[in-house]
Amino acid sequence: MRRKSSKQLFSVLMAATMVMSGISIPVNASQVDDAVVRSVLTKTEATASESREINFNEGWKFHYGDVENAEKKDFDDSDLAKWGNLKLPHDFSITQEPSNSNEAESGFMPGGTGWYRKNFTLPSDYAGKSIVLNFDGSYNHTYVYVNGTKVGENHYGYNDFAFDISKHLICDGKTENVISVKVVHQTPSSRWYSGSGIYRDVELIVTDAVHVSRNGVYVTTPNLATEKGGNVTVKVQTKVQNDSNAQVEAKIRTTVLDAEGKAVSEPSTTDVTLTENGTEEKEQNLKVNNPALWSTEKPNLYYVQTEVLVGDEVKDINKETFGFRYIDFNSNTGFSLNGKNVKLKGVCMHHDQGALGSASERDAVYRQVSKLKEMGCNAIRTAHNTPSSVLLKACNELGMMVMDETFDGWAFPKNGNSQDFSTHYNKTISEDNKLLGATAGDTWYKFVLESNIERDKNDPSVVIWDIGNELNFGVTDPSKYEQYAKNMKSYIEAIDKTRPITVGDNNPYGLRYNTYGDFRNKVTAVLANNGEGLAGANYSMAAMSGIHSAHPDWKIIATETASPSNSRGIYTTLSQYGKSGDYQCTAYDTNAVSWGNTARESWWYTIKDDFVSGEFIWTGFDYIG
């Protein structure tokens, strides 16, 4: 009874906190009439009919546990005692009871199966349009149905994924459509608290049949270092697609806008011939006079506006955020931003929001980034998975650099987590799975990695791609890991060559002594040789000088450092090894894990050598698990 009452009190306090901070929370099913929800939903989406990207977070129903036939359109979800109304993003693990029978790494919280359903109507002017259902992330095995038809599935808990659902929808302003989503979280699946369910944003992307492809605009400023202060070249590569059954003659009109939406370039227009159900890519070069640079102090943002015209009619308008900034990693002088040497004062970050769980609430994410900025941090490593779009948007706007990490482990489970992404890493995508951007026969790791790079390639905050972390755990046959690294390097560089690639190598002494018998060091060499990528080293900061001596052409980054053991608010000088009698550790930064360093020791190793580009301390915020 005491445990239950404590939990109830905690829930009340958290609800009050979230309401005061503007963070939305799911409403209990018994408190909201189902008809009211459906009415509001219809009104909201009719109002948004002119939007290209429609927020689709409102008006969902949720059931914890598997339910037979819940994918069917006519399934009865009216029982409010079983199907609660909620707003996404949503984590269905955080509201469950913790149990010591669950793994500590996941905060003793369960996984399980959850069903989401959404009823909605679409206006008649949507008929004939291209309609894409886009998920920014769902943990972890996600199966999507539209009006009873399965459109596909996704098996990584952190990548964005989407489906073209146009042909499955009824757009007449009165007939209800139903989207059903089954999310299965089999445990153990993670070395940290992952959460469960549709924990990131969902949106509908509604366009004309002739439109800019999803993630179809790539913006670079290849000559910025020499052109800054004058007329700067903006190179724009645009993919346009035609979902109709007839050839179309179209035009692409591209303009650079400032943060207020004012044009700062002359428009560039080019013709494009689109075959039926075809896609074409065009390149345009625009000039912007003396643009304001993006930096951590002044994160100036711009937009590339792309209009697709057929005749004189504008069929689609797409706006892509970018920033004018140039980066460099040097084997002797480290990292520079816009020509100025800067140490990356970074932290590693898991994605949970404490008592809110894994739900990617905008206000909570912006609060975290703001707090890190206040303490002097200028970079985040998204340990150890693809970040949310919300986090990257916050970093773009607030001036925080990002090491954008896609994977933790690869083809083998880590720490006994038999249900992690290794179950699908090397499996191939089936032909009936209609994931946008996927090709039947591609491996899941290729699809996930490419999805990450395609989505994030224009974010000025992203300065490093990271493809893995401490790869040795659980690996019984590393013979293919060097080839995996080569594959992933080629996948990334086919999309973006403006950022270096790294991996968090936890055998830095192997790098120092050139012991390439260890496959981790072979992976690092694939990325760092010839000065192409970054040699990423986890912990053992004392090895940095040796790595530099052994490989003077390598560019070096401390991908994970420190890991001090401090208890918040505990300040004592009388403890032994930093621990008091009640197992609290002093916050005077005198204690660290055996494989790490105190925060000040790690920082000393970072600043004493110019060739060390920076460090990412473990960890920026406390996390569950």
Q: Model segments located where?
A:
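Active-site mouth of glycoside hydrolases
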Residues: 158-167, 187, 192, 326-534, ...
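Extended carbohydrate-recognition surfaces in non-catalytic/accessory domains of CAZymes
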Residues: 32-134, 189, 195-198, 210, ...
